[in-house]
């Protein structure tokens, strides 16, 4: 074999080795590519790709890999590497996660950002670690109320109304305020209001717009200076998979995560304001929730949702107190 042939073989072997060593991570989520949750995941993927550390993140949007509520178990088993996931979906496996969709625990987006780096969230992450799961990007999204015939700002406003809530804890609180509950996905709110089945609804800011609820309601209470509905929807990763990456890959991933987290917070705030603009444009009255109304809701939540959570989970009171202690 001559020197030229040997050189070609050596170069080929090096190229093949580089190809083999490039690791691909699979990231799953339930939303379209236009959604903010896809966009922040894409920021992480793009940053990792540009770092040239032999690591690629392939995103599977729109429920194309797993059904939304079925992503947590595959993540814990290493069958899925990463997911943008509303953590309360896994509240059946880990009851503590239900605190990440609990009425009145988060007041606004800046409060949510403090919650992300609080002793409360540290405890939640310790529980995740027992399932071999870790957080890559923190983030909460907010929501509000809409009323077919009147504004829904305080507890008295829902008395006697057929209401849709986003999450079991919110349903429990609304029943405590005197509402009747009609359980349905947010995609069904429009028709339910149109046919008179529903008089009030609670969902995320983005869902209010994407499902055109502004065509069916008289008044909208958005997430403003105070809001009742916040849902923790982080980017999670299998912990063992992260630890299997080399130092450069880990650093690139977390640098991308830092950029994505800042974007996610800014866009979450923009979504709330964008929903206000759309409802206003369509002639819907806008009425924000006052601090006193927020406190009135929280008082009812303490006697309903919080009490139910604590009674069903032995470590519930300690974790609830930690969450309530975040200023």
PLM features: residue spans?
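Bacterial N-terminal signal peptides
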Residues: 9-17
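Bacterial N-terminal signal peptides that target proteins for export
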Residues: 1-8
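N-terminal secretory/targeting leader peptides
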Residues: 12, 23-111, 120-327
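Absolute protein N-terminus
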Residues: 1, 22-23
């Amino acid at each position: 074999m001559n020197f030229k042939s040997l050189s070609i073989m050596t170069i080929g072997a090096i190229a093949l080795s580089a190809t083999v060593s490039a690791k691909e991570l699979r990231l799953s989520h339930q939303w379209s590519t236009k959604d903010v949750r896809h966009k922040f995941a894409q920021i992480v993927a793009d940053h990792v790709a540009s770092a040239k550390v032999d690591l690629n993140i392939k995103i599977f949007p729109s429920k194309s890999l797993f059904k939304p509520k079925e992503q947590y178990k595959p993540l814990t088993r290493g069958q899925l590497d990463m997911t943008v996931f509303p953590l309360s979906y896994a509240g059946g496996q880990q009851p503590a996660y239900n605190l990440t969709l609990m009425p009145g625990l988060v007041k606004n987006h800046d409060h949510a950002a403090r919650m992300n780096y609080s002793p409360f969230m540290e405890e939640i992450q310790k529980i995740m670690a027992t399932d071999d799961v870790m957080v890559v990007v923190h983030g909460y999204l907010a929501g509000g109320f809409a009323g077919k015939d009147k504004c829904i700002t305080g507890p008295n406003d829902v008395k006697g109304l057929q209401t849709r809530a986003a999450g079991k804890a919110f349903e429990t609180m609304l029943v405590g305020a005197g509402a009747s509950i009609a359980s349905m996905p947010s995609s069904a709110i429009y028709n339910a209001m149109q046919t008179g089945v529903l008089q009030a609804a609670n969902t995320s800011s983005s869902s209010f717009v994407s499902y055109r609820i502004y065509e069916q309601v008289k008044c909208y209470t958005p997430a403003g200076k105070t809001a009742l509905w916040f849902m923790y929807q982080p980017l999670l990763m299998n912990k063992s998979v992260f630890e299997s990456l080399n130092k450069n890959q880990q650093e690139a991933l977390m640098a991308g995560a830092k950029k994505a987290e800042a974007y996610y917070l800014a866009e979450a705030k923009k979504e709330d304001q964008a929903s206000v603009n759309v409802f206003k444009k369509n002639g819907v009255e806008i009425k924000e929730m006052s601090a006193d109304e927020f406190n009135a809701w929280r008082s009812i939540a303490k006697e309903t949702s919080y009490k139910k959570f604590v009674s069903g989970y032995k470590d519930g009171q300690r974790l609830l107190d930690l969450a309530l202690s975040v200023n």
